[in-house]
Amino acid sequence: MGALMIQGTGSNVGKSLLVAGLCRAARRRGIDVAPFKPQNMSNNAAVTPDGGEIGRAQALQARAAGLAPSVHMNPVLLKPETDRAAQVVVQGRAATRAAAADYGALKARLMGAVLDSFARLRTTHELVLVEGAGSPAEVNLRARDIANMGFARAADVPVVLAGDIDRGGVIAQIVGTQAVIDPADAAMIRGFVINRFRGDPSLFDAGRRFIVERTGWPDLGLVPWFPDAVRLPAEDAVDLRRASGGGGLHIACPMLSRIANFDDLDPLAAEPAVRLSMVPPGHALPGDADLVILPGTKSTRGDLAFLREQGWDIDLAAHLRRGGRVLGICGGYQMLGRMIHDPEGHDGSPGSTPGLGLLDIETRMAPEKRLTRIAGRALGQPVEGYEIHMGRSEGPDCARPFAHIPEPDGATSPDGRVAGTYLHGLFSGDGFRAAWLGQFGAASALDYGAGVDEVLDRLAGHLEAHLDIDRLFALAR
């Protein structure tokens, strides 16, 4: 059957969900399908069975396709560490750090890894559905591009262009894309899709005809807004504010500047008994929160300074005085200790940074990243998840571990109101989540994993109702 690529008119136009839904639709047709994204930029990484890293969106797409995630589904992952530099993960392994100004020169060497991973998927699966990054209209990035048209032309993969009508200006998005890209790039596009329409679709019939007349590209369909998308794991930080609920247990989470693996919160956001508040910079932690979760971060020391700049350290102290509780996950756990030592400068400049002092532990950063899937027990319940961090934490409070995986993990304060763990994904386990929420008097009867698959099935049905799926798949080569 071949391969087909979904590119977008911009970031966050719904490419990831379109590919996930198409993967599930292909699977329902009995097609052996695999997702692929040449280059992703995200601190929300998933750990593959062989201990590699890929973007969380590709892990969800793999689930939609009925596959275990593979490092070849996202061969280049950029994990921002500062506004101008990122860690570069190649085929699942951290390869180097690169400043934004230097990354262009590196991309020529990365194309080989991208094409190698793509070839592996293409030879082992009937159909490969490829997701682009950002937009091909970013012509300043076209030279040495590996994420959009540079890849599509190198691998000879036809493209469908997706525009987002919800943000407005979708006619200009699509027509403008054709106007600014190279004619040879435009020739790779086999049609367009309008995503996230609200209201009566017939009201946009004239707009769709105009796009066809101006571009010559076939109209492959208009996809109405899919409200259940909020129940699927988010990858982009831009999606964080969506998390909410109306339950009685109020959980607050500060939006750190380098927040990572925040999909840890998705099972909690799905709980009817939970109200989850994502607290943006410049806002105080809510005084009525029962629990504050300090999430993972790509830069523990940098985000600890950011946390203090927001005054959230003062808010945390007040929260504890009111009888609240605090849980730190990964980098958030490291922040809770007395000191973070980084003599070799693996997380910023060499030196030591005082922590929040809420746990009697100290953390020492190390060059080796612990990257592994684990299973163990916590609160008498089985837990599964993964670790993805640098550094090791030790101290008296580690004598009261948060979990056993099977070795002791994490720490708990003597009064039990402050705890930390290195374990990501622990809330996805229904038994543990129910036991953990039960400590707060909140009940849970949610089957989170089944809920994700139900939404993926509904997403596939939604696309099947509004797109000519068979025509789309016939474009693959």
UniProtKB/Swiss-Prot annotation:
It comes from the Bacteria. Pathway: Cofactor biosynthesis; adenosylcobalamin biosynthesis. Keywords: Cobalamin biosynthesis, Glutamine amidotransferase. InterPro entries: Class_I_gatase-like (IPR029062), CobQ/CobB/MinD/ParA_Nub-bd_dom (IPR002586), CobQ_GATase1 (IPR033949), CobQ_synth (IPR004459), GATase_3 (IPR011698), P-loop_NTPase (IPR027417). Pfam families: CbiA, GATase_3. GO terms for biological process: cobalamin biosynthetic process. Residues 248-432 form the GATase cobBQ-type domain. The active site is at C330 (nucleophile), H424. GO terms for molecular function: ABC-type vitamin B12 transporter activity; catalytic activity. The keyword Lyase does not apply. Catalyzes amidations at positions B, D, E, and G on adenosylcobyrinic A,C-diamide. NH(2) groups are provided by glutamine, and one molecule of ATP is hydrogenolyzed for each amidation. Belongs to the CobB/CobQ family. CobQ subfamily. This is Cobyric acid synthase. It comes from Paracoccus denitrificans (strain Pd 1222). The gene is cobQ.
